[in-house]
């Protein structure tokens, strides 16, 4: 929002120092806007690996869904590179980082970063886009679902990049860009076509043991990110030799491809078995994914809130206020809300709403297009709004 210009001024020095690097390659594995590059290679090989590893006893529905995914391969590739070009993204790619030991991105762990911390991490983005992908797939929107899955795999690839898992930015070390360019130039040498296991062997079968997607996803990503972080200190920093960089890139990219095949395998099973992992489980947090309308003046500078009321009459409301500008025309903004009641289940929530409060005496109107609410790895509410909200107003979404 424009009212947050003072926040941007705090960021100005940091943004200026990174700008020259950003215009080259600040992000993790390379990716082009046309769906090519290292990220796209990882996503493509993830599908190839799974196809090669598929055991003969996999259910027909899994095979059919894999075929649908293959038919939408270009959307997977486009999604796998899109986060580096998303106009809604944070300027410094803060949410592309995740230290598996601290659970933070560099905005909380780096001493030089003095601005507002960003709550989103590469790990949380994996879970968000996976939830959106499963939701759209189950509705038959395979093209959009595959694009979202590609976005999720982009962030998995980021979490599996040595510099990103160690929270070492291009400000911290020139090796960040150099190493990832090194890997991009040699990516075809690092392709793998199998994990060495069939889907009825331990690597794949273990992927299905935890029905709680959020819990499984976090620990699955953590196992790969820990290896990537160790690689930074042992083989990928600026003190290491070219041979050591070659080893680091080979291991990290092989793991990225292997892990991607695992995520896709889990995705295919989740969309095929029809189970709802959010049902009858305690909800610790809600994630709101809000799209602002694309027409002129649809955005707002006013204060925005999200609230819930439970069946026993308890209410909780949160401010929706990301660092930088949000609720801008055409923007897609994500907010995570921690629930005070740790024993709450999604069915215990009776009402949800968004509320607008005027920033100035006059305020301005706001036109949200859509809001999706995610709980326990599933989209539990999808509301098309497309209405103007004026003044101090509350709009009930449930």
From Swiss-Prot:
Residues of the PLAT domain: 284-398
Molecular function per GO: phosphatidylcholine phospholipase C activity; toxin activity; zinc ion binding
Catalytic activity: a 1,2-diacyl-sn-glycero-3-phosphocholine + H2O = phosphocholine + a 1,2-diacyl-sn-glycerol + H(+)
Keyword Metal-binding: yes
Keywords: Calcium, Cytolysis, Hemolysis, Hydrolase, Metal-binding, Secreted, Signal, Toxin, Virulence, Zinc
Domain of life: Bacteria
Annotated signal sequence range: 1-28
Protein name: Phospholipase C
Record's GO cellular component terms: extracellular region
Main localization (coarse): secreted
Domain text: The protein is composed of 2 domains; the N-terminal domain contains the phospholipase C active site (PLC), in a cleft which is also occupied by the 3 zinc ions. The C-terminal domain is a putative phospholipid-recognition domain, which shows structural homology with phospholipid-binding C2-like domains from a range of eukaryotic proteins. The ability to bind membrane phospholipids in a Ca(2+) dependent manner and toxicity is conferred by this C-terminal domain, which also contributes to the sphingomyelinase activity.
Assigned EC number: 3.1.4.3
Binding site for Zn(2+) 3: 84, 96, 154, 158
Compartmental location: Secreted
Zn-dependent PLC domain sequence ranges: 29-278
SMART domains in the cross-refs: Zn_dep_PLPC
Biological source species: Clostridium perfringens
Binding site for Ca(2+) 3: 300-301, 325-326
Cofactor binding mode and count: Binds 3 Ca(2+) ions per subunit. Binds 3 Zn(2+) ions per subunit.
Binding residues annotated for Zn(2+) 1, in chain numbering: 29, 39, 158
Keyword check for Transcription: no
Residues reported to bind Ca(2+) 1: 299, 365
Linker: annotated span: 275-283
Residue numbers binding Ca(2+) 2: 321-322, 324, 326
Function: Bacterial hemolysins are exotoxins that attack blood cell membranes and cause cell rupture. Constitutes an essential virulence factor in gas gangrene. Binds to eukaryotic membranes where it hydrolyzes both phosphatidylcholine and sphingomyelin, causing cell rupture. The diacylglycerol produced can activate both the arachidonic acid pathway, leading to modulation of the inflammatory response cascade and thrombosis, and protein kinase C, leading to activation of eukaryotic phospholipases and further membrane damage.
């Amino acid at each position: 929002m424009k009212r947050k210009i003072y926040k941007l001024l705090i960021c100005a020095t940091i943004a200026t120092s990174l700008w020259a690097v950003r215009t080259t390659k600040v992000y993790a594995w390379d990716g082009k806007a046309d769906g090519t590059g290292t990220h796209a290679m990882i996503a493509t090989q993830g599908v190839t690996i799974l196809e090669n590893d598929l055991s003969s006893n996999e259910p027909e529905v899994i095979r059919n869904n894999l075929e649908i995914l293959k038919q939408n391969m270009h959307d997977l590739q486009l999604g796998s590179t899109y986060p580096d070009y998303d106009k809604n993204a944070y300027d410094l790619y803060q949410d592309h980082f995740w230290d598996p030991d601290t659970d933070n991105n560099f905005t909380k762990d780096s001493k030089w970063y003095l601005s507002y911390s960003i709550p989103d991490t590469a790990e949380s983005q994996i879970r968000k886009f996976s939830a959106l992908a499963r939701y759209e797939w189950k509705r038959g929107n395979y093209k959009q679902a595959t694009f979202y899955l590609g976005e999720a795999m982009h962030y998995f690839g980021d979490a599996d990049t040595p510099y990103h898992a160690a929270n070492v930015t291009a400000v911290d070390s020139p090796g960040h860009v150099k190493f990832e360019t090194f890997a991009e130039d040699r990516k075809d040498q690092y392709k793998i076509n199998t994990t060495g296991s069939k889907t009825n062997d331990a690597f794949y079968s273990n992927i299905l043991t935890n029905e709680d997607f959020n819990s499984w996803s976090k620990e699955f990503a953590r196992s790969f990110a820990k290896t990537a972080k160790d690689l930074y200190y042992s083989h990928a920093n600026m003190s290491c030799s070219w041979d050591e960089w070659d080893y680091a890139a080979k291991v990290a990219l092989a793991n990225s491809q292997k892990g991607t095949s695992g995520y896709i395998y889990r995705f295919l099973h989740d969309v095929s078995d029809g189970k709802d992992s959010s049902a009858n489980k305690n909800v610790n947090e809600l994630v709101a994914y809000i799209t602002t309308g694309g027409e002129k003046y649809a955005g707002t500078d006013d204060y925005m809130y999200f609230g819930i009321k439970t069946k026993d009459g308890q209410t909780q409301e949160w401010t929706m206020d990301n660092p930088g500008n949000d609720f801008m025309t055409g923007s897609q903004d994500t907010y995570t809300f921690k629930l005070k009641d740790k024993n709450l289940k999604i069915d215990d929530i009776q009402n949800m709403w968004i509320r607008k409060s005027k920033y100035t005496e006059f305020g301005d109107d706001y036109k949200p297009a859509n809001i999706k609410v995610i709980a326990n790895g599933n989209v539990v509410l999808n509301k098309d709004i497309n209405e103007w909200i004026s003044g101090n107003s509350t709009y009930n979404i449930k």
